[in-house]
C-alpha cells in the first residue's frame, strides 16, 4: 500500500482530486463541504463524513457529480481523467455499469459518449466567455492548506488568479431569475464556501488579506450553455463569514476534545409555522363553497349525506 499524501500549509498546484478528498493535510482538516455539514446538521454527521476520522468512511459515487467534475477537469487542461464509455445510451445495462465501476476504481470519471460531447460544448462556451469578459483563470484545480489557531483547513480552487478566486458551477436551475438563484446559493452553502475559500487564501497569502475577491461562474448544463458571472453583496459576504467562523470554531473544539455530539437528548418544542396558522385561520372565516363543520353535521343528522 502506498503512503497517503500529506501536505504542509501552502499552495499545492498539482494534487489529484482523490488525494484532496481523502484529506491530504498534515492533520485532519476541515473543507468547505464539511463546514456546511457542521452548520446544517451536527458534529456527529461531520465526523461520519470525514475520511480520516470515520474508519468506515466510503467515498460517495454519484452520477450527478460526474458532469460537473468532468467540465472542471476539461477546463483545467484536458480529458486525462475522463473515461469515455462507448456503445451505450445510459447506464442501465450490466456491461455499462461494470465499465463505470472499473473507471471509478481507477480514479477516472466515467462518461457516456453524449455526456462527453456535452462537456466539450459547455467548456468551449465557458472559455470563450471568460476570454471575452477578461477573466483570467490562472491556476486551476490547485489546493490551499492552512492552519487557523490549531484548526487545519483545506480548499481546492477551481481557478485561482490572485486576487480573484473563480468558482465554476454547472447548473440546471434558471439562471435568469436572480431571486431564485440567490435562494439556491444560500441553500447550497455557497455563501459560506466563498468566505471559507477567501479565509484560507488569506491565511496562505497574508499579504493579500482584505484584497481577495470571489466570484461564481454559473454555466447552464443545457443549451445554449450560457454563463453568468455572480459576485456576493455585502450581506451575503457577512453571513457567509459568520457561518464559516461558526463551523471552524466547532471543528476546533470537537477535534480538540474528541467529542462529536449528535442531537440533544432533551425535548424541544417546535413553533407552529406562522404561514400555516394564517392559512387555516383565513380558511375558517373566509366565504367558501365548502360546507363548514356545523352545516355538514346538520345535514348528516338529517340524512342528507
Task: Please tell me what each predicted stretch does.
Residues 1-155:
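Metal-dependent nuclease catalytic cores that hydrolyze phosphodiester bonds in DNA/RNA
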Residues 57-60, 104-111, 177-189, 233-235:
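Short histidine-centered catalytic/ligand-binding loop motif
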Residues 66, 152-154, 189-192, 196, ...:
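Short, well-structured alpha-helical interface segments that form or flank functional binding sites
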Residues 75-79, 170-173, 202-206, 252:
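Hydrophobic/aromatic-lined pockets within catalytic cores
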Residues 129-136, 161-167, 202-212:
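Secondary-structure boundary elements
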Amino acid at each position: 500500500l502506498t503512503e497517503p499524501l500529506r501536505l504542509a500549509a501552502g499552495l499545492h498546484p498539482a494534487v489529484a482530486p482523490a488525494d484532496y478528498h481523502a484529506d491530504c493535510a498534515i492533520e485532519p482538516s476541515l473543507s468547505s463541504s464539511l463546514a456546511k455539514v457542521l452548520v446544517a446538521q451536527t458534529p456527529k454527521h461531520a465526523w461520519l463524513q470525514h475520511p480520516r476520522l470515520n474508519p468506515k468512511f466510503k467515498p460517495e459515487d454519484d452520477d450527478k457529480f460526474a458532469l460537473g467534475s468532468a467540465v472542471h477537469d476539461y477546463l483545467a487542461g484536458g480529458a486525462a481523467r475522463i473515461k469515455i464509455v462507448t456503445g451505450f445510451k445510459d447506464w442501465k445495462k450490466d456491461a455499462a455499469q461494470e465499465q463505470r465501476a472499473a473507471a471509478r476504481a481507477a480514479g477516472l470519471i466515467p462518461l457516456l459518449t453524449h455526456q462527453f460531447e456535452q462537456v466539450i460544448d459547455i467548456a468551449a462556451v465557458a472559455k470563450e466567455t471568460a476570454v471575452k469578459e477578461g477573466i483570467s483563470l490562472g491556476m486551476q484545480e490547485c489546493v490551499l492548506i492552512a492552519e487557523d489557531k490549531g484548526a487545519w483547513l483545506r480548499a481546492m480552487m477551481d481557478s485561482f488568479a490572485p486576487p480573484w478566486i473563480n468558482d465554476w458551477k454547472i447548473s440546471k436551475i434558471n439562471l435568469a431569475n436572480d431571486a431564485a438563484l440567490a435562494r439556491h446559493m444560500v441553500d447550497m452553502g455557497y455563501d459560506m464556501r466563498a468566505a471559507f475559500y477567501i479565509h484560507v487564501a488569506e491565511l496562505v497569502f497574508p499579504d493579500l488579506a482584505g484584497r481577495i475577491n470571489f466570484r461564481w461562474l454559473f454555466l447552464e448544463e443545457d443549451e445554449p450553455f450560457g454563463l453568468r458571472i455572480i459576485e456576493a453583496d455585502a450581506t451575503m459576504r457577512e453571513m457567509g463569514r459568520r457561518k464559516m467562523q461558526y463551523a471552524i470554531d466547532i471543528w476546533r473544539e470537537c477535534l480538540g476534545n474528541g467529542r462529536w455530539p449528535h442531537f440533544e437528548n432533551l425535548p424541544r418544542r417546535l413553533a407552529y409555522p406562522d404561514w400555516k396558522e394564517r392559512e387555516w385561520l383565513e380558511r375558517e372565516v373566509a366565504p367558501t363553497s365548502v360546507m363548514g363543520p356545523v352545516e355538514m353535521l346538520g345535514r348528516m343528522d338529517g340524512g342528507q349525506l
